[in-house]
């Protein structure tokens, strides 16, 4: 099965440095690897966001931090939007 391409928004790249500093780099990389294989795989569970964030998905890095992403199904691309803040 062909893997999905991951594309990182500028803020997500900046967030990753914070994630590493907080000791959550391995957890984030594990989630990114899951997204690369299948962005709809469960477990771990994902949340389909609503309201202003409609079209985005979220997975927990830990209790406080979320990995937020968008899935472009037609071209098999996952756009990583954020990895630090809680839905901002």
List each language-model region with its residue ranges.
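Blade/loop signatures of beta-propeller domains
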Residues: 37-39
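Enriched for short, Lys/Arg-rich terminal
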Residues: 2-11, 17-18, 22-30, 43, ...
């Amino acid at each position: 099965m062909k893997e999905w391409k991951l594309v990182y928004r500028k803020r997500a790249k900046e967030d990753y440095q914070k994630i590493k500093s907080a000791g959550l780099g391995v957890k984030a990389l594990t989630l990114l690897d899951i997204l690369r294989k299948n962005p709809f795989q469960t477990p771990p569970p994902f949340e389909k966001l609503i309201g202003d964030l409609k079209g985005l998905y979220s997975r927990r890095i830990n209790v406080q931090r979320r990995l937020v992403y968008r899935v472009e199904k037609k071209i098999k691309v996952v756009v990583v939007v954020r990895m630090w803040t809680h839905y901002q």
